[in-house]
C-alpha cells in the first residue's frame, strides 16, 4: 500500500496482512491511497489494484477502505507513450506515438486491435459526465476510435517485439516540420493514424510506408489524423467483442460539447494508461481502478517528454518483462528523451520498411 501527498511529495509505503495495512508517522493532510498486489491462480497471474483520492487523514486511528479489482495480466501493454509534443511557441504535436509491447511468452496478433483516448468529464473536470446507459460503470467512453487492419493472422507480434502507432509516420526531426526540435523519426512505425494523404490546416499530411489505420468511430469534431491531449489523457487498447457502430452515439445527460461518445466495454480492454497534466490531476482520475489505479504527469505540454514503462526483469534470452501492476503511478516513469523501442524491443518481421 502507498500513501501519497502530491502537494508535499510525501510517500509512505507499507504492506498488508489479511487485507489490512497500518501506517504510522503520517502528517495530517490530503492523500491518495493506492493498493497493488499480484496473485497466481489457475496458471494465470492476476493484478490486484485499487485507489482512493482526496482522502483526509487528520486524526490518529483514521480508517480508509480501498476497493480493489483483480484483472488478468495482459500480453500486450503500452510500453512508451509520447504525447507532449515540442516547441511551445509553435505548438508542434504531430510527432505523438504509442508503442505497444508483447510482454508475454506467446505470439499475439495485433489484427483488429483498437486504440482510443477516453472521455469522462469536461475540460476543467468541473462536470463529470453521467452516461444514460445501463451498467454505465462497466464501460469507458471515447469520441474517436482507431482500429488496426488485418484478417486475424496478418500481424503477429512475438514475445519481446513491439509495434508503434504514429500519429503521422514521417521524420519529425525535419527542419521544415518541427524546426529540428522534435526528438523522433517515426518513419519506422508500423502503423499511422491517418487514412489517406490529405491537407489539414495548410499542412500536407503525406501517406507514408506505415500501414494506415481505420477511424471506425468519430463522435466529435472530425480530423484526418489522431491528436490526443498534449497535457496527457486516458489511453485504452482494446479488442471489441462486437462491431463498433459509428452512429447512435451516447450523449451524457449533463454534456457539454465533448459529451457525446461511443461506449467501450471494460471487459474488452487489454491495457490502459492514465496521464494527467500535473499533480493536482490526481484528485480526479477518469479510468476505473480495474483498469488503472494511478496516473503520471510530464513537466508540461510541448516539452518533448514521454512516459515509459519500467523494466520488471529480464528473461534468460534477454527479453525484457515490463512492470504491469495496473497502476501507472508505479509502472511508468517520465523520460526526457522519447525513444522508439527503448531497451532493445524487437521489430516485427513484417515491418520490411524500417530501414528504407
Give residue spans per PLM region.
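Short, ordered, surface-exposed loop/turn motifs in non-cytosolic proteins
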Residues: 1-8, 108-112
Amino acid at each position: 500500500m502507498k500513501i501519497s501527498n502530491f502537494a508535499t511529495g510525501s510517500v509512505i509505503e507499507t504492506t498488508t496482512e489479511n487485507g489490512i495495512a497500518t501506517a504510522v508517522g503520517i502528517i495530517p493532510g490530503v492523500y491518495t491511497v493506492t493498493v497493488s498486489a499480484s496473485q497466481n491462480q489457475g496458471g494465470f497471474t492476476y493484478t490486484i489494484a485499487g485507489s482512493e483520492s482526496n482522502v483526509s487523514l487528520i486524526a490518529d486511528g483514521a480508517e480508509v477502505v480501498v476497493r480493489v479489482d483483480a484483472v488478468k495480466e495482459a500480453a500486450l501493454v503500452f510500453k512508451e507513450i509520447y504525447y507532449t509534443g515540442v516547441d511551445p511557441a509553435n505548438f508542434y504535436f504531430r510527432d505523438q506515438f504509442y508503442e505497444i509491447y508483447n510482454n508475454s511468452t506467446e505470439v499475439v496478433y495485433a489484427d483488429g486491435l483498437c486504440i482510443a483516448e477516453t472521455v469522462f468529464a469536461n475540460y476543467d473536470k468541473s462536470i463529470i459526465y453521467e452516461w444514460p446507459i445501463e451498467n454505465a460503470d462497466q464501460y469507458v467512453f471515447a469520441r474517436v476510435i482507431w482500429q488496426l487492419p488485418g484478417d486475424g493472422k496478418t500481424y503477429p507480434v512475438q514475445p519481446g517485439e513491439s509495434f508503434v502507432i504514429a500519429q503521422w509516420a514521417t521524420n519529425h526531426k525535419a527542419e521544415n516540420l518541427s524546426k529540428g526540435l522534435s526528438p523522433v523519426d517515426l518513419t519506422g512505425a508500423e502503423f499511422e493514424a491517418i487514412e489517406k494523404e490529405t491537407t489539414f490546416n495548410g499542412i500536407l499530411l503525406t501517406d507514408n510506408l506505415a500501414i494506415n489505420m481505420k477511424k471506425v468511430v468519430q463522435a466529435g469534431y472530425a480530423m484526418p489524423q489522431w491528436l490526443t491531449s498534449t497535457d496527457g489523457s486516458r489511453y485504452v487498447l482494446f479488442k471489441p467483442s462486437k462491431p463498433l457502430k459509428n452512429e447512435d452515439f451516447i450523449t451524457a445527460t449533463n454534456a457539454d460539447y465533448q459529451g457525446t461518445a461511443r461506449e467501450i466495454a471494460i471487459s474488452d480492454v487489454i491495457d490502459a494508461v492514465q496521464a494527467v497534466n500535473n499533480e493536482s490531476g490526481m484528485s480526479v482520475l477518469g479510468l476505473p481502478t480495474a483498469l488503472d489505479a494511478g496516473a503520471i504527469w510530464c513537466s508540461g505540454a510541448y516539452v518533448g517528454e514521454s512516459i515509459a514503462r519500467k523494466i520488471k526483469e529480464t528473461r534468460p534470452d534477454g527479453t525484457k518483462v515490463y512492470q504491469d501492476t495496473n497502476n501507472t503511478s508505479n509502472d511508468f516513469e517520465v523520460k526526457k528523451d522519447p525513444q522508439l523501442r527503448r531497451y532493445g524491443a524487437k521489430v516485427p518481421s513484417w515491418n520490411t520498411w524500417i530501414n528504407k
